[in-house]
Amino acid sequence: MTDPERTSDLHARAEKIRRDMGGAEKIVRMHEEGDRTVRQHIEEFLDSGTFREIGTFSRSLRVEERDHTPGDGKIGGHGNVENRPVTVFGDDISVLRGSSSIVGTRKEHRLYERSLAMGIPIVHFGETGGARIPDIMGSEGISEPGGLSNWRSDAIGCQWPQ
């Protein structure tokens, strides 16, 4: 396979992940119920053609979930609103109800870091099913979700009411 063929294959795989999300049948059901996907929310919010996604190929760390967790239930990146840069992310409820796990949380963390470094706003389209219990069990899982909320507070100088 040549480099152009590899590049074309990579783009085709990314497009399939973006199109299929957590499964075509789930997307159809959402539309029948009058709901939109998080991708649709993001595309309608941002200026047309400006969304640059990160982590398209990410998926669950758990081997038994890798084949059905595109993006690990989180979609995010950078784009523009009225020609101004913004970071945007959301919970993909077509993938395990948008539940949080280690990889999705890391992706969120990376978006927060980049947004704060660039000094741009963050918009979150939230509709999560909570945390994935198997992913938050054990030392690695327990350290991830809480670490993100503490990091957010420290990074933006936020103080929580006591």
What are these regions (language model features)?
Residues 1-162:
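Terminal-region recognition feature
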